[in-house]
């Protein structure tokens, strides 16, 4: 009987790896470990933000599903407004949204004006931080919710701190809470393809003397590490009509992005009572790329003169829906942006993105 030829070191390594993979699959199930080339490469599923410029700045057309995102900025900068617009876009695509209102400050009438279907929105107003994050975990595990927004990290107070004496120090309690919760949440978020957005506030660092950024966000460093997207939103200009203030010019900077190049910016108007002005973006971006021609203060679309001054053109486009949709279609085609859809998590079961948490 002929002897089997001795295995080369490389063949022995391959056989050992094959045995290990078989053992892992028997113990933990099919697809527990695989080569990246074996998985289905699909476009990252996203939920649009409601802002064309911000979708463009994010590089993938919106907030990625199956990942953690953070929106932070000063007070009254538009953090909750942006989050509500993302919820509205999710609902337009047939998705289910949940809003965990740790601040107990959600204005449902304002949310409705931004396009949120409040009768379909799941809302929770938890008593303490552990409860809020536990509710978020259960919603994500259900795989039946497309987006969960937590407003805000600063309001996620540990139960021990709430039950303590006013003024008593609980050093690092919130940071430990966030670190523990995110360790638990991230794997589930990825499997369920739920988009989870944390709204955060900024604080001034104590003792910073001239070097480095004096601002920091609340809740420790865990959220910074676990977030795939971090957006810094700021009001940069007050919009006035004579003496009447009607909105603010807002800048969003993508300071961290694991799914596309970071440090891109978006500029848009937030109008009081109606939120992000998509029509204003059509004018700004359309002028930048040449879809809308600007001569002095006059604007034109093709052979059609739109009017003089941005506010007059904005009013015209809001009244003339057919014209507005035509401008938007031309702009989106020029920018190469694809329409989004809510993806069933089961469609991409086991699929891996190029960059994990």
Swiss-Prot record:
Keywords from the UniProt entry: ATP-binding, Cytoplasm, DNA damage, DNA recombination, DNA repair, DNA-binding, Nucleotide-binding, SOS response
Gene Ontology MF: a single term: ATP-dependent DNA damage sensor activity
GO cellular component: cytosol
GO BP term (any one): DNA recombination
Gene3D superfamilies in UniProt: P-loop containing nucleotide triphosphate hydrolases (3.40.50.300)
Role played: Can catalyze the hydrolysis of ATP in the presence of single-stranded DNA, the ATP-dependent uptake of single-stranded DNA by duplex DNA, and the ATP-dependent hybridization of homologous single-stranded DNAs. It interacts with LexA causing its activation and leading to its autocatalytic cleavage.
Family to which the UniProt record says this protein belongs: Belongs to the RecA family.
UniProt protein name: Protein RecA
Organism: Nitratidesulfovibrio vulgaris (strain DSM 19637 / Miyazaki F)
